[in-house]
């Protein structure tokens, strides 16, 4: 950029900064109340911080899943048009020479939620804030614990009699935890 253009750009930036310096604040919006903030402050951390009270079993989760989730994810978490929820590390092994071709042909069969998510608490967090797709945040905390328990069972990470709550859920070891880079210790 020639020197004259640099000078003009510099003068323009200095003028724009000075012109805005004396302008009053815009003052849009209003402060959130604690109740409003609490509705949105629902992030669950890998260590279980911010998990709500409640509990849910695999058996309860199976019934809720069939009513609320199976239409999109399939009866067993592998048949639906939406993301695969259950299964192994994917249909295609890392050593499969045709892996790239198969992935392009069957993109939803690569990784299940149980194989790619590093923390069980992330499943709870996602289900609570985003599912079911047609009515996000409509499940109670007990229902979310139950659906999470069922999804973990579909992935053979917990037994058929498992009950998830704020103590049990963070203790579930996910297969991807060891192969993930995380900001959480």
What kind of region is each of these model predictions?
Residues 1-8:
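Bacterial N-terminal signal peptides that target proteins for export
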Residues 78-123, 132, 166-169:
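Gly/Gly-Pro-rich "capping" loops immediately C-terminal to redox-active cysteine motifs
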Residues 98-102, 134-185:
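Flexible coil segments in periplasmic/lumen-exposed cytochrome c-class electron-transfer proteins
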Residues 59-67, 78-79, 117-121, 138-141, ...:
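Sequence context surrounding c-type heme c attachment/ligation sites in exported
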Residues 16-20:
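N-terminal signal peptide c-region/cleavage motif recognized by signal peptidases
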Residues 61-76, 85, 97, 147-151:
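The canonical Cys-X-X-Cys-His
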Residues 27-64, 132-136:
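Electrostatic cytochrome c docking/interface patches
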């Amino acid at each position: 950029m020639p020197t004259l253009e640099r000078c003009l750009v510099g003068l323009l930036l200095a003028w724009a900064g000075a012109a805005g310096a004396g302008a009053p604040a815009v003052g849009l919006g209003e402060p959130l109340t604690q109740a409003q903030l609490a509705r949105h402050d629902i992030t669950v951390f890998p260590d279980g911080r911010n998990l709500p009270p409640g509990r849910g079993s695999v058996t309860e989760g199976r019934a809720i899943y069939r009513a609320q989730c199976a239409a999109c994810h399939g009866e067993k978490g592998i048949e639906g048009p939406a993301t695969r929820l259950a299964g192994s590390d994917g249909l295609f092994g890392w050593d499969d020479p045709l892996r790239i071709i198969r992935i392009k042909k069957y993109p939803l069969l690569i990784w299940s939620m149980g194989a790619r998510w590093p923390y069980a608490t992330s499943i709870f967090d996602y289900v609570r804030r985003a599912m079911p797709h047609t009515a996000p945040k409509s499940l109670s905390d007990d229902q979310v614990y139950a659906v999470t328990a069922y999804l973990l069972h579909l992935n053979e990470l917990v037994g058929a009699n498992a009950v998830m709550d704020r103590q049990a859920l963070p203790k579930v070891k996910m297969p991807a935890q060891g192969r993930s880079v995380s900001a959480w210790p």
